[in-house]
A protein has these predicted regions:
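Sec-dependent bacterial lipoprotein signal peptides
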Residues: 1-26
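An acidic-aromatic pocket/loop used at catalytic or ligand-binding sites
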Residues: 2-5, 27-137
Length: 137
């Protein structure tokens, strides 16, 4: 009986492996971009907006970059939850208001704020801001 159970578990595993491989290879692919000296993962389908000018948020003045692409906000959220954790970043807060979501991460004394909001044309604007946290006094 035990042999039959082990055999069926192995069969199930072998059936799921191609599906898992497909999900891994077709998921939201990434590339790394350097912002304020940090390698930050960016979804592959996002292109940089070099002329985008915005006021930095206090605490995130070290550097910023803006991107735009046809990536759903939920995909961006899931992407950053996965890749930032894999790089050792800890989520510290999440904000949602008026069609704009933000997630803040910390690693050591460095801070990263990821903001994203959908456009009416089906694209999403992604803004990444980097800062340095002052040591406690």
């Amino acid at each position: 009986m035990l042999g039959k159970f082990e055999h069926s578990s192995l069969q199930r595993l072998l059936l799921w492996m191609p599906l898992i491989a497909l999900l891994i290879t077709t998921g939201c692919q990434k590339r790394n971009e350097v912002i304020a000296g940090l390698e930050i993962p960016i979804p592959e389908k996002m292109t940089r907006n070099p002329d985008k000018v915005f006021d930095p948020i206090p605490g995130f003045q070290d550097g910023q970059a803006s991107y735009q692409g046809k990536v759903a906000p939920k995909e961006i959220f899931d992407f950053y939850q996965e890749v930032m954790a894999a790089k050792g970043w800890q989520p510290t807060s999440r904000f949602a208001r008026n069609e704009q979501d933000s997630i803040a991460y910390t690693k050591g004394n460095r801070l990263v704020l990821v903001k994203y909001n959908p456009n009416p044309d089906g694209t999403t604007v992604l803004t990444v801001m980097v800062g340095t946290q002052d040591p406690p006094k």
